[in-house]
């Protein structure tokens, strides 16, 4: 645990020196034999409680370096057998199975201030939408069941796991309950088109951001 914390502390110091204050890590996804290599060694293993503890240590290491961690990919990407950069990942596990495994690392660390959704479709909750675009998963599972009340950012909305155009994805992710919409590919036209009709940042999102900064500066 200390090795993990120290390793992420050193990563955080490097990022800080480069002027980067937020890191989209650590990964709290559980590793299965069938897990797609896109998760790979970013996962801390197959035991949900070990993943929980090591993920927490990684988050603390980044915090100690002055960098905000983002735990991902809530509510759990480990069961997916495809790469969500190119294909929509679908999870058919029951809620009972998910509660005994994939949900645990996120629920155990629900007090962390920042999380990123996975573009995973939980058929048992919402068979029609991936998490990023699903109010049923975001409000029903992430907010209510897991009790995560921090800042929620989407995974990259340019990824092919999602339907429709990028501007439509932005609208849908915010409507579903994401606080922030992430676009990583630098397509300026997409970005301009995406912000035309989006609502102003809500007071709740501002409160969550303020809480994130308070957490970073706390002992």
Question: PLM ranges: what are they?
Answer:
Residues 56-57, 62-63, 67-215:
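Second-shell residues forming the walls of enzyme active-site clefts
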Residues 218-219:
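Short, low-order "capping/linker" segments at domain edges
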Residues 35-37, 46, 51, 95, ...:
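A broad, structure-centric signal for solvent-exposed, well-ordered loop/edge residues
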Residues 1-14, 45-54, 98-99:
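Glycine-rich anion/phosphate-binding loops
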